[in-house]
Design a protein with these regions (language model features):
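A generic "binding-loop/recognition-motif" signal
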Residues: 2, 27, 158
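Accessory nucleic acid-recognition modules appended to NTPase machines
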Residues: 71-171
């Protein structure tokens, strides 16, 4: 967890005497390599190999591709512990958020809208209709906290106009 210090706090504390290295989940080819499959593995596949790759793809989609997950038997429990640490430590406690219901709704709505444009106004309206009234700025702040703790990432919107890029971010 990064609940002790987020990267912006590390920079100010260490005064520039550090190098930030972000470690992201595996791409699917990297995931296959971590499973012991040669990089040319996908080029020459028998029927048995195809079935194995489909099974690996299912696991990749279901559990994600954190490098340490390759060797962990109970993946769901491990992922849940990461989520709880980030959610409770890095988001709720660090930012003194007491509206747990609203934060969970924001996460659920973003999760069900993956790769689709989603405005902060829309999120605020969804919360209001569910009984959790939050202003647009509070929603923006909460999503920012989620991004600071690496729970969410934005997907680059390749719209030609700046306004289109910035008004409907994708996560």
């Amino acid at each position: 967890s990064n609940s002790k210090m987020l990267s912006s706090e590390i920079a100010s504390t260490l005064g520039g005497r550090f190098m930030r290295v972000d470690i992201y989940p595996y791409s699917f080819p990297e995931y296959l390599a971590a499973q012991g499959k040669d990089k040319n593995y996908l080029e020459v596949l028998s029927t048995k190999d195809r079935a194995e790759v489909v099974g690996m793809c299912d696991q990749y989609v279901k559990y994600g591709a954190f490098p340490e997950l390759v060797d962990i038997r109970n993946k769901r429990e491990y992922l849940n512990s990461i989520y709880q640490t980030i959610y409770l430590g890095d988001i709720m406690t660090r930012n003194k958020i007491t509206n747990d219901f609203a934060v969970r709704l924001i996460l659920k709505k973003i999760a069900e809208s993956v790769a689709k444009p989603l405005s902060f106004n829309r999120l605020s309206n969804v919360l209001k209709s569910a009984g959790a009234v939050l202003g647009k700025q509070t929603v923006i702040n909460y999503v920012g906290y989620m991004m600071d703790s690496y729970l969410l990432f934005t997907l680059q919107n390749y719209a030609a106009k700046l306004v289109e890029k910035e008004t409907s971010p994708k996560y």
